[in-house]
Regions:
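Mature extracytoplasmic or organellar-lumen-exposed domains after removal of signal/transit peptides
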Residues: 1-208, 212
Length: 212
């Protein structure tokens, strides 16, 4: 409830909330864009939509779509989910609630509302990560199948794709295990299926360079 640091015009609570929003990666005006537009901003295919203030440049701090917000938009543009809208709206509504306290301690009622926003954010964010695991598991499998029949000329290119997909799969599967929910044996099974390292072209399992 106190200023984040001496001279700061925002509280520690506001700072923590803003930091979480930064990790989420949505633009400040993402709710004014469709999921397709947010996705295309992240892919640098629609920078006109990114330039909200019309100054001719894209402010990477407030006008660009990064990180998990990008992945959410990639799923939402199919029309079956609204992860980006739901999470971003909860962030903005929660920020307004914190600000309305004017630096004072939140009332029990306000804190309950804030925790409801937190639950909306965390549950939907977890689904974004889970969908990403599913997506890259499929991409990794398809790439492995392709490697079985690829010509020598295309081997390096296809192997690069496999390594990228496996890296994404491993990263998201690990992220799924460090949230507030303990997924227990599911995490252990997931780690065994994904493996501790990708398969190399000599059919050996890559582990680490740490011993070299």
């Amino acid at each position: 409830n106190k200023p984040y640091k001496e001279g700061a015009y925002y509280t520690g609570k506001e700072h923590s909330w803003d930091e979480a929003f930064g990790y989420w990666g949505a633009a400040a005006h993402s709710l004014l864009l469709s999921a397709e537009q947010n996705y295309n901003v992240a892919k640098k295919k629609d920078l006109a939509s990114a330039d909200f203030n019309g100054d001719g440049v894209v402010d990477l701090k407030s006008e660009y779509v990064f990180a998990h917000a990008y992945y959410a938009s990639s799923f939402d543009k199919g029309g079956k989910t609204t992860y980006l809208e739901d999470i971003t709206r909860a962030f903005l509504d929660g920020r307004k609630l914190i600000t309305s306290a004017n630096g004072e301690k939140l009332s029990d009622m306000s804190r309950a509302r804030l925790m409801a926003y937190v639950d909306d954010i965390s549950s939907n964010w977890e689904k974004v990560i889970a969908e990403s695991v599913f997506k890259y598991a499929g991409s990794t499998y398809k790439s492995l199948v392709a490697l079985e029949d690829v010509s020598n000329a295309d081997l390096a290119k296809e192997f690069d794709k496999y390594m990228k997909y496996w890296g994404e799969l491993k990263g998201f599967s690990m992220a799924l295990q460090v949230g507030k929910n303990n997924i227990g044996e599911t995490g252990a099974k997931l780690n065994r299926m994904v493996g501790f390292g990708p398969m190399l072209l000599d059919c050996l399992l890559y582990t680490s360079d740490a011993a070299d």
